[in-house]
Amino acid sequence: MNDNAKVFSLIEMREMMIDTSDYQMMEEVGEFTGTLEMKAQGHKKSIRIFLTLDDGRKIITPIFWWQTYLGFYYMPIGTKLRLFYSESSLNIIYLEKVEVIGQEQ
């Protein structure tokens, strides 16, 4: 795997003292554009993706194995994305679809 596509383990994040406190869960449905900043292991075969939206918000989103990780597992950091968030029948906001629109220079 390309180092630019690395998925950090929880131990690596702790050892490197990576602070993710600025990131919040997405709270609205809609289409957004942003940049992939980092990826980390989650729980129960998931990964967490860290995004900066074009409006400046910092978002954390869990992606699950049954979503085939939406292509994020091997996606390079810095990838510009169009993100489509939806609401489940349980009123949970989730990332339904993603489109690559470019690579940050």
Locations of regions flagged by a protein language model:
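Structural detector for short beta-strands of small beta-barrel domains
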Residues: 5-45
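Beta-strand/loop nucleic-acid-binding surfaces
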Residues: 57-75
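Acidic surface patches and DE-rich sequence motifs
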Residues: 39-42, 53, 86-88
